[in-house]
């Protein structure tokens, strides 16, 4: 099926979730975003695409009674981060006063050739009190909010190990004179988490109240060192999604971490799901807060043999079956169990982020997706450089509403 011409937008409680948007229509890359090949130096493709996407999202949020000015969180995926500065110039046009918190990373190809970025936005309903806060943590000289409180939810911008003066600061680097003493990924992770501690304390909360994490690693071989530090900060860890990315916005940065927390008064319920495979790493399968359930990114693994046997193609019959369909079905069946344990159901999903190692697997993924979702929730699909289980093709990250 071709990409939807209009964003899918769903309200859940006080929040409004939109599908990730690229600059495409039913004919491919939208004509009004193209640079005339006869005049290749006149105009900016990234600026045109950014405007096109934000105009579409403006209309979509208006249908739910919200506007871009009510957006509180953005995930932005660029196929080439050298486009970031021009993108941010347009971002300032659309968010002149209170920009949303933002996480920006490099990603692989989009679903439509020629599309340079994907924008994923979440908004708050206009009648809900929103408080923007600042912190003493280092901040980049670009257009985003450090933190926004919406009811009991605390949204923060993604953080890298940077002081935004020298790049990666000395305290987050291994001394080049002593290259075998210490770990860059551990130092960067610790630096980031220390700054997040400052961020959430400024909101009157703490790391203890984090309810969801997205982690973007440039090299997945760094995961184990990162996870060791993660355990120091999270004795009781939140749900987490971890994917590989080709690039980050700070030179030599190895990881970007993106967190959502809640206020101390909000009740958090960790969800135990005994009938799905127990993860090897340090995260919870799901967590319920108020009327939302946040699930960890799910992979097609039993955490014993790698790719789960029932998700594999029999090597003796390599042309019988589809690996991407098998993995997608395996993951969604486990997410059915996860949401059931939380007291809700898969059909109440209000937001999905899907990470594919090969964007050409999208068609097979979508066939199975539509078996489970005749009407798809808002969905963002991005190409990652890798996942944490060898030979896994897909990771699925879902948020569901309570009945």
Label for each model-derived stretch:
Residues 1-55, 59-73, 77-194, 198-212, ...:
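N-terminal presequence-like segments and the immediate start of the first folded domain
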